[in-house]
């Protein structure tokens, strides 16, 4: 209940502290007494930070996957309606070969499929629990790391405690996956600008 109250009030109401973790602990103690200090048992800010990053990043990656799949479905639906709609294919901004709207749209659907795979791959490595690593060498408390991971929705553990506390490669991998997705979407957007200038498509005012 104390944590729910803190979330409802917003982090702007937290008391001063060395960092957000200490501030939250102080806020909990203010609400439930000294027993609130036990929430830090068997944990360090090192594995807490690592867990929070992974927990939040997992949400962002899953939202990205969902949005990318929805975009692919839209492209596939429009493509299905235009399998025989002829359009020019461009090279160097010049009409070069005839193709179909379906052929063109499916090229981006294929690229988005690879983008989705990259996000799934990244999520597999993101969604590992570092908790139990403590500062970097574990904790003397006999905790069940696998149970903690299960309760927080992680698929498994970062097995090595030093790696668990210090690893940030999953951030680079996820950033690269989103950057690649952005390149795909940028290409589609640029194409639509070119096609709208040539009069082949008309963009809604909300996007123009």
Regions from the PLM with identified roles:
Residues 1-128, 145:
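A helix-coil-helix interface module used to build multimeric assemblies
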Residues 20-38, 100-208:
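Internal glycine-rich alpha/beta core junctions
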């Amino acid at each position: 209940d104390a944590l729910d109250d803190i979330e409802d009030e917003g982090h702007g109401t937290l008391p001063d502290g060395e960092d957000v973790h200490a501030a939250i602990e102080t806020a909990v103690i203010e609400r439930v007494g000294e027993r609130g200090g036990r929430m830090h048992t068997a944990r360090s800010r090192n594995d807490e930070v690592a867990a929070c990053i992974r927990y939040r990043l997992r949400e962002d990656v899953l939202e990205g996957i969902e949005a990318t799949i929805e975009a692919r479905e839209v492209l596939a639906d429009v493509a299905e309606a235009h399998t025989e709609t002829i359009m020019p294919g461009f090279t160097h901004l010049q009409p070069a070969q005839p193709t179909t709207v379906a052929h063109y749209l499916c090229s981006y659907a294929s690229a988005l499929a690879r983008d989705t795979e990259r996000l799934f791959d990244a999520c597999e490595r993101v969604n590992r629990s570092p908790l139990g690593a403590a500062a970097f060498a574990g904790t003397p408390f006999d905790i069940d790391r696998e149970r903690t991971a299960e309760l927080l929705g992680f698929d498994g553990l970062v097995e090595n405690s030093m790696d668990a506390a210090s690893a940030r490669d999953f951030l680079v991998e996820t950033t690269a996956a989103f950057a690649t997705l952005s390149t795909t979407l940028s290409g589609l957007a640029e194409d639509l600008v070119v096609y709208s200038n040539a009069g082949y498509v008309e963009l809604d005012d909300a996007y123009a």
